[in-house]
Amino acid sequence: MTSPSSSFWNTASREAMKSGMFVAKVYCFLHVTTNYLGFMAYAYGPSMIPTLHPSGNMLLAERISKRYQKPSRGDIVVIRSPENPNKTPIKRVVGVEGDCISFVIDPVKSDESQTIVVPKGHVFVQGDYTHNSRDSRNFGPVPYGLIQGRVLWRVWPFQDFGPLGPTPT
């Protein structure tokens, strides 16, 4: 025969276990989704004007294509910064492996240009607003391994909600 207090504790422990399992399932779902399928990225600053607003954008990026195909010219990608791994800038791919890229090193200060060949396993990324962008002109070509995902959609600001596909460069 069970006492009323032990019945209460049995019921409470069962409910706690159910709740704990639900929380664990939600956490696992979110972990798999954000680490393997897609994620939300926040972009702010002037480096991608006119494509992105300098005051801030919420973007939907996917991680699947980086596993099965190489980035293409014109793709907007989220990268892990080669200079500061805590930052994830958003830039446009302007050159893929084997491309010969000529660029002005610092368009604000001079018109000195440089030409490089993008090495195998790398991409050359650049902000759309080259006068105010820290990109491959500063830190060199980016290895594929630092690409976190490809941007698909702008989610916020809502009036500009929609796809952000590649544009010719």
Curated annotation (Swiss-Prot):
Gene3D superfamilies linked to this entry: Umud Fragment, subunit A (2.10.109.10)
Protein name: Mitochondrial ATP-independent inner membrane protease subunit 1b
Keywords noted in UniProt: Hydrolase, Membrane, Mitochondrion, Mitochondrion inner membrane
GO terms assigned for molecular function: serine-type endopeptidase activity
Functional description taken from the UniProt entry: Catalyzes the removal of transit peptides required for the targeting of proteins from the mitochondrial matrix, across the inner membrane, into the inter-membrane space.
InterPro entries recorded: LexA/Signal_pep-like_sf (IPR036286), Mito_IMP1_subunit (IPR052064), Pept_S26A_signal_pept_1 (IPR000223), Peptidase_S26 (IPR019533)
Annotated EC: 3.4.21.-
Assembly and interaction partners: Heterodimer of 2 subunits, IMP1A/B and IMP12.
A GO CC term assigned to this protein in UniProt: mitochondrial inner membrane
Active site (record annotation): S47, K91
Xref: Pfam families: Peptidase_S26
UniProt record, GO biological process: signal peptide processing
Source organism (scientific name): Arabidopsis thaliana (Mouse-ear cress)
Protein localization: Mitochondrion inner membrane
Disulfide bonds: none
Family that this chain belongs to: Belongs to the peptidase S26 family. IMP1 subfamily.
Gene name per UniProt: IMP1B
